[in-house]
A protein has these predicted regions:
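Phosphate-binding loop of NTP-binding sites
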Residues: 19-23, 57-61, 70-220, 226-237, ...
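Short, charged/polar "capping" segments at the starts of alpha-helices
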Residues: 34-39, 57-58, 73-76, 142-143, ...
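A conserved, hydrophobic alpha-helical segment in the catalytic core
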Residues: 20, 175-189, 228-229, 265-303
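Short N-terminal binding/cap micro-motifs at the start of the first secondary-structure element
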Residues: 12-15, 36-37, 142-143, 275
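ATP-dependent carboxylate-amine ligase
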Residues: 1-34, 42-49, 62-66, 82-87, ...
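Beta-strand->loop->alpha-helix junctions that form or flank phosphate-binding loops
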Residues: 51-54, 90-94, 135-138, 234-252, ...
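Active-site-proximal loop->helix
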Residues: 38-45, 102, 145-150, 310-311
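Short pre-catalytic strand/loop immediately N-terminal to key active-site residues, enriched for Gly-Thr
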Residues: 264-269, 317-321
């Protein structure tokens, strides 16, 4: 099968391209720019385009399929040529569904927790040598690729993202997978550039639950009131299976999970991660892993890439980096670190970097998000606001939104860096939360602060 990728350099797109190459397909692609790690991974497989840009001459009737990435625009020259030739054009999720029509599809959805839960499930399967197909949004320890597709495996585990499918298909990705087994971890308004109201956002999850095949199941977080409402209101003929955060204790900085065999030391921490673990456990049991085998495997799970990643530790201090940027994730992550290191002063730093977080109307959703921190810092770049064509936000708006009088706010990366590097980190816990990099912060240098 000959497949051409328009915008092959994307995080998801290049992984799908590599997965199809590994499956024996003929794969080509184009993009106007490609950064690492995508660039080096594509190069290793011989899939890196010879030149960057869009080349309509690459599109011919010999192609069996076009996979269109979100980075491409609706007037992309290659897309227009493919439409002119009447070629079959798939969005990323559409093509994944085509590859998994004859498998049991396990789809993990939710505003937060989906990457971690998907990673937990795959870790458990890998630990017990159970081979499954998958697509996950983070690099996992022990896994070479983030997408795997085979002809033989019975199960495919898919991280179900609610963002749009492609420039010409405005449906959320997770509407296209038609799960047999689904999980819903949480609903907290996000992506306001495409879901302008809370009700509009919640509606996408209702559609997701109704897309589960007849006789399938939804495992859902019963502690999230919106999730419970959405699932319980659905008239789809599916099994509805609630889960709750398991009992656990924290002793001397170590989390102990209560199991039928007694307390089990685990590597992850925080109530939100224990809640994720409960969901992963039920999905693994649906996939044939018994409870004891799940506990044995999950004890060795260190977390998904970029999620509560410990970057430095000394005798008296510790530093974590986390991808958290939405209000619910920021709140859960900050609470988790404080609960784990109650005896340390927590310095929590958040970069407002996404379209939603830099929107003056949406800012109020961050109310109380940093309350668990002893020292709370917010950084944002005026350049990021300008690039996203948003109205400027002021220090006063941010302070008012977080409802914290002692909030420290920076919009200059050098001033933020000066603050950070002037701190005494004795008996401190440092938490850096962002989907960006604080205007070019050297994380290796940050590690040196704790030595």
């Amino acid at each position: 099968m000959n497949v051409h990728f328009i915008a092959i350099g994307g995080a998801a797109m290049h992984n799908l391209a590599i997965a199809l190459h590994n499956k024996g397909y003929q794969v080509t692609g184009s993009d106007d720019t490609i950064f690492n790690p995508s660039k080096s991974r594509l190069e290793t497989k011989g899939l890196l385009p010879e030149s960057f840009g869009w080349f309509p001459e690459k599109i011919s009737s010999s192609l069996d399929a076009i996979v269109l990435g979100m980075h491409a625009k609706a007037d992309n020259p290659e897309l227009l040529k493919a439409q002119e030739l009447g070629l079959k054009i798939y969005s990323y999720p559409e093509f994944l569904y085509e590859q998994s029509k004859n498998k049991t599809r396990v789809v993990i959805g939710g505003s937060h927790g989906k990457t971690t839960i998907t990673s937990m499930i795959l870790h458990v399967m890998h630990y017990h040598d159970r081979d499954v197909d998958y697509m996950v949004g983070a690099q996992l320890e022990g896994f070479d690729v983030m997408v795997k597709l085979t002809e033989d495996n019975d199960f495919i585990v898919l991280e179900g993202d609610e963002y749009l499918s492609s420039p010409i298909d405005r449906r959320p990705k997770f509407h296209l997978y038609k799960p047999n087994i689904a999980l819903l971890s949480g609903i907290a308004w996000d992506h306001i550039n495409v879901f302008p109201t809370y009700d509009n956002y919640v509606e996408q999850f209702k559609i997701f639950v109704d897309s589960i095949v007849n006789g399938g199941s939804i495992t859902y977080n019963a502690e999230d009131a919106e999730v419970a409402r959405v699932v319980e209101a659905s008239e789809n003929t599916i099994r509805k299976l609630p889960y709750n955060t398991p009992e656990y204790t924290v002793e001397h900085g170590e989390t102990l999970l209560e199991t039928p065999e007694g307390p089990l030391p685990i590597e992850i921490f925080g109530k939100h991660n224990l809640n994720n673990l409960a969901g992963a456990k039920w999905i693994c049991q649906h996939m044939g892993i018994d409870e004891d085998d799940f506990y044995e495997a999950i004890a060795t799970f260190k977390g998904a890439s970029k999620r509560l990643e410990k970057i430095a530790e000394s005798k008296t201090s510790v530093a974590y980096k986390d991808f958290a940027h939405s209000p619910s994730k920021v709140s859960a992550t900050t609470q988790a670190v404080k609960a784990q290191y109650e005896d340390k002063t927590l310095i929590a730093c958040l970069e407002l970097h996404t379209y939603s977080s830099l929107n003056a109307e949406f800012l109020k959703e961050y109310k109380g998000a940093l309350d668990a921190a002893d020292v709370a810092v917010v950084f944002y770049s005026p350049d990021a606001v300008e690039i996203k064509k948003l109205d400027a936000v002021s220090h006063e708006q941010i302070a008012h939104a977080f409802e914290r009088n002692d909030l420290i706010i920076y919009n200059n990366s050098e001033e933020f860096k000066t603050f950070l590097f002037s701190q005494d980190f004795n008996n401190k816990a440092l938490l850096l939360m962002s989907s960006g990099n604080y205007g070019g912060l050297d994380f290796d240098a940050v590690k040196g602060l704790l030595r």
